Regions:
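Acidic, Mg2+-coordinating catalytic module of metal-dependent nucleases/exonucleases
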Residues: 83-89, 95, 128-167
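Conserved non-catalytic scaffold segment of RNase H-like nuclease domains
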Residues: 1-87, 133
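Substrate-recognition/cap helix-loop segment adjacent to the acidic, metal-dependent catalytic center
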Residues: 90-111
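Short, flexible loop segments at boundaries between secondary-structure elements
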Residues: 108-128
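Amphipathic alpha-helical interface surfaces
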Residues: 63, 67-74, 92-99, 116
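Intrinsically disordered, low-complexity terminal extensions
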Residues: 35-37, 44-45, 70-76, 98, ...
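Hydrophobic positions within alpha-helical membrane elements
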Residues: 9-11, 121, 147
Length: 167
């Protein structure tokens, strides 16, 4: 699964704004939290993230508990244990895991880490990536772009089912 989050990090907390998750089979999940405090957002987040969110009446707006439950169901609907990939995903994984409280609350059927797509791209020899799409910094747009970047990297440096380079 390829994902992205948008969040507000004001120095002592990280608040989820939105999350987009894309499966290799084309399924998608998108949600916007009803619980973030927009007044904590810096100018960059207001201009580049909050301005792109759907209207508050859109069904993507959900409480964190609903986002947590729906994201878990989405990620575990298929066969096997899910694998998460993100581009510079350290904060993404923290804000994702915080949906369950602390790291100990993360369900056992979800990964304890996110695979780093930017590092994979570097190891694959920095192949030419797809153009950054219009609407970037929308979590779902960025998650879709992460899948496209992964496919480019797989052509340059294929991985086997265990995640090892297969050349």
């Amino acid at each position: 699964f390829f994902y992205d989050t948008e969040f507000i990090a004001e120095g002592s907390t990280i608040e989820l704004v939105s999350i987009g998750i894309v499966a290799e089979d084309g399924r998608e999940f998108y949600a916007v939290s009803t619980e973030f405090n927009a007044s904590n957002a810096n100018e960059w987040v207001r201009e580049n993230v909050l301005s792109k969110l759907p209207r508050a009446s859109h069904p993507a707006w959900k409480p964190l508990q609903q986002i947590r439950d729906e994201a878990h169901a989405f990620l575990t609907a298929g066969r096997g244990k899910p694998e998460l990939w993100a581009w510079v995903g350290a904060y993404d994984h923290v804000v994702f895991a915080q949906l369950w409280g602390d790291m100990a609350g993360l369900p056992k059927d979800l990964p304890r880490y996110t695979r780093e797509l930017k590092q994979y791209w570097q190891m694959a020899g920095r192949p030419r990536l797809p153009k950054v799409p219009d609407g970037n910094h929308d979590a779902l747009v960025d998650a879709r772009h992460n899948l496209r970047k992964f496919r480019v990297c797989m052509e340059a440096l294929p991985l086997d089912a265990s995640g090892a380079a297969s050349r």
